[in-house]
Amino acid sequence: MNFEQQTMNNQIKAVLFDLGETLLDFGRIKPTQIFREGARLSYDYLKSCGQPVGNFEYYCWSNLIALRLRHFISNITKKDIDSSTLLEKIGTRKGIKFDAEQWRHFAWLWYEPLSKLATTDPKIKETLISLKGLGLKLGILSNTFVNAHSLEKHMEQHGILDFFSVRMYSYQFDFRKPDQRIFKIAVERIGEAAENIMYVGDRIDKDIKPALEIGFKPVLKAAYTNAGKTTPDGAWKINQISELPALIKKINDIAASS
């Protein structure tokens, strides 16, 4: 390998993103309140479709308890659940009969109140266009129990879904971040060597440290989840996603001139 090839091998060729507090900013939320809003929307939809629903409070709390129990188990097993599948199983046991599209809409109604809280960098589309203009591959690697259909509908509403050729959600796997296996699969799917991949996330423990260990170039996105914490050595920190094009150009220019 000649010198030019070595320097090119240090350049960024792909960027992987986390979702929550990275591409989509939710901030601090009130989970039970948001859950009740989702329960009300889904309950009303069931009633409008003539499905068996019973008392609202029972409907709300029985679903909440079931989800919290599964979430507790997932924290032990380190495997995220697919909340949509769980809600469908609960509904089917109660006699609800929907086709696939109705179940997807049902799941979206549970997620919709949370989606309305999300904001994005005002320049996010411009930023992603710039990154694609640099010839970079873009992807998503996120820990989540929200079904892909709901997440991707949400991203589509913000006009950013189609920028990402690779989309990986932890509930689709038997492990989640910070497990190295999910990062290795991301390397395979994005089709670039680890040292040529930048990973952008908000969690030091689940995003930045494992990204460093596998050889990525990690970037910590400022968020309430890392407020007051020290950025690990070897990582960069940004306040806004819109800072990425300039940072990547700087890193790649240094690599090319080395």
Which residues does each predicted region cover?
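N-terminal helical cap/lid subdomain that shapes the substrate entry/recognition surface
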Residues: N10-L134
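Asp-based, Mg2+/Mn2+-dependent phosphohydrolase catalytic module
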Residues: N2-V15, S48-G54, K125, I129-K132, ...
